[in-house]
Amino acid sequence: MVLPEEPAILEVRHAVRRWIAAHAPDGEIAVALSGGADSLALTAAAAAEARSVCALVVDHRLQPGSADVADEAAARARALGCASAEVLPVDVTGSGGLEAAARQARYRALDSARGTRPVLLGHTLDDQAETVLLGLSRGSGGRSIWGMSAYDTPWGRPLLDVRRALTRQACAELGLSPHEDPHNASPDFVRVRLRTEVLPLLEDVLGGGVAGALARTGEHLREEGAVLDAMAADAQAKAVVEGEIDTALLALSAPPVRRRVLRSWLLAAGARGLGDTQLRAVDDLVARWRGQGQVAIGGGTPDARFVVRRRRGRLNVGLDDRRRV
């Protein structure tokens, strides 16, 4: 399909072209297509810019008629010039709420179907701003407000500098009517309320430009965080001895570096749901040691939880019987 040279679709195409040149020069990509405006504009641009595009349409099967919506999206992808389009039905189950369960099921399906291709996602600057706000609400340190990166293998996000309104304009220029997912308007979901209530209020009170400022903040923190991560990798190589942390060696590092080392070490040991409070308590075992007891962290078994103990100047992760708590 030959795309019209209209302002919005050209901007989306330029964003996709830059991403392909930087991350997929062979031009072999997959696109996650929901049928909504963001992914539809992305798919149209990708089909015009890439050598070969495989459209992947996830059917979450959460609403009546979802199979028809998925089939229509796949047909549109083929009409736009995608080499192939595949519908991926999934079962949405698991803990953490419907939003999280659907996301996990979607990413598993996309990863399984992509082969060796990177998968382009339709996240926009507005999505980035919402992600940074969600991270701020958790208060889990700088990493939680990094936002999303343009390429986190295998996930590509070419539209992080493009506003959501522009993808809608691009669809209008193409004569395409995007699918409107009812879940995207439901106040039951935190991200929807951020989009429809919080961000518009911030834009109004602060005089505009909030979404862009949030996205830039996330990008700056991500760049600085990459430097700290490199420093932490070096510190970890020195401080981890036989799977344990040498507290004297780790104490030589600055607090942000120490916490990165501890986070990496704990996750490798099997910690789950690691929060800032737990991480700082473990850091206290290194830098503010006063003989305090063990620190409980997430993970373990049904009968025993993971704990961190300090013994003879080293930290180790062990199990503690939950039934004694």
From Swiss-Prot:
Keyword line: ATP-binding, Cytoplasm, Ligase, Nucleotide-binding, tRNA processing
Taxon lineage: Bacteria, Bacillati, Actinomycetota, Actinomycetes, Mycobacteriales
CDD domains in alphabetical order: TilS_N
Protein name according to UniProt: tRNA(Ile)-lysidine synthase
Binding site for ATP: S34, G35, G36, A37, D38, S39
Similarity-based family: Belongs to the tRNA(Ile)-lysidine synthase family.
Catalytic activity, as annotated: cytidine(34) in tRNA(Ile2) + L-lysine + ATP = lysidine(34) in tRNA(Ile2) + AMP + diphosphate + H(+)
Location relative to the cell: Cytoplasm
Any one cellular-component term (Gene Ontology): cytoplasm
Family matches, as HAMAP family: tRNA_Ile_lys_synt
